[in-house]
C-alpha cells in the first residue's frame, strides 16, 4: 500500500498522474483517499493536478468507438443547486439535430439525481444502454457511457465520494475522460472563478474545441439567471468571454425556476419538455444546446444554434429519438 502525503502539496502533472494512479488502483486506504480528496478540495486543485489526474483515469478506461465529430455535453456536478437534468436533455436535443452525442455520466454522487438516475427513470435499462452503446451511437447518434462501465477503477472511489457528499477532483476528472475520446465538448463547472484553471487543464490535454462554462450563481451549466463565464478552448489555447441568455433572445429566469427533485421528478420534467412544455427548463436546454452545437462546429452563430435546438424540440425529433433509444437498448 502507498502512503498519501498528509500536507497534500501542489503536484506537477506527472506527480498527480502517479498519485492518482495509486488511488485508482486501490493502493491507498479509503480513509487516506477521503482525507486526501478533501484536502485538495479545500486548497483548490491546480490545472496541472487536474490534467495529471485525468491522464491517470484515461489510462485505465475501457474505450468505445465513436463517429467523427461526436460530442459530449456534461457538468461536473456538485453545484448544490439540485436543478433539473439540463445536459441530459441537451444531449437528446443535439443528437436529434444531427450531431452524434457520446454522453458520459454517472449516478448522483452529491446531488439528488445524476444523468444515469434520470435516464433509468425514463425507461432506459442501464445495463442494456452500456452493452449497446457503440450500436446506438452509430445507428441513431446517441449513447450513454455509464462511468462505472468504462472506468472500473472508479468503483472503488464512488462509495468514498458518496460518503463525503461534496465535490472533489473526481467531479473535474470525469468530463476530461470521455471513453469515446470526443474532441469537442460543452463542460459546465460549478465555480465561475475556476473556469480559467479548468480551461488550462483542458488545454494541456488538448481538444479541437471545448466550451467550459459556469453560471455566476455557481451553476455547472449556462444559466438564465445572469452572466456566465465561458472559456473557448481550441487546441492547447483558450480565450475567455462573457455570455448571456438574452443575447439569443431567451428571457431571464432565476435558478429556482429549474429546481429539480429525485430521478422520477426529473424524468417527468424531461419527458414533458420533449413533448412541448414551454418555460425556463426548455430555455435553459436551448441555451446549452446552442453552445454545444457551437462547440461541435455544427453552427457558427449562437442564434442559429438556438433555432436548431428549438426545431429539434418542436418537430418532435428529440422525443422520437428517446423512444428509439429505449427500443434499441435491450
Swiss-Prot record:
Q: Name one GO biological process term.
A: L-tryptophan biosynthetic process
Q: What class of enzyme is it?
A: transferase
Q: In which pathway does it act?
A: Amino-acid biosynthesis; L-tryptophan biosynthesis; L-tryptophan from chorismate: step 2/5
Which UniProt key words apply to this protein?
Amino-acid biosynthesis, Aromatic amino acid biosynthesis, Glycosyltransferase, Magnesium, Metal-binding, Transferase, Tryptophan biosynthesis
Give any Pfam family that matches: Glycos_trans_3N
Question: Transmembrane stretches, by residue range?
Answer: none
Cofactor(s) required for function per UniProt: Mg(2+)
**InterPro entries xrefs:** Anthranilate_Pribosyl_Tfrase (IPR005940), Glycosyl_Trfase_fam3 (IPR000312), Glycosyl_Trfase_fam3_N_dom (IPR017459), Glycosyl_Trfase_fam3_N_dom_sf (IPR036320), Nuc_phospho_transferase (IPR035902)
Q: Where does Mg(2+) 1 bind?
A: 87, 221
| List of residues binding anthranilate 2 | 161
At which positions is Mg(2+) 2 bound?
A: 220-221
State the source organism's domain of life: Bacteria
Q: Where does 5-phospho-alpha-D-ribose 1-diphosphate bind?
A: 75, 78-79, 83, 85-88, 103-111, 115
Q: Which GO terms describe its cellular component?
A: cytosol
EC code(s) of this entry: 2.4.2.18
Which PANTHER family did the record assign? ANTHRANILATE PHOSPHORIBOSYLTRANSFERASE (PTHR43285:SF2)
Assembly notes: Homodimer.
Q: Which family does it belong to?
A: Belongs to the anthranilate phosphoribosyltransferase family.
Q: Please report the name of this protein according to its UniProt entry.
A: Anthranilate phosphoribosyltransferase
Q: What is the lineage of its organism?
A: Bacteria, Pseudomonadati, Pseudomonadota, Alphaproteobacteria, Sphingomonadales
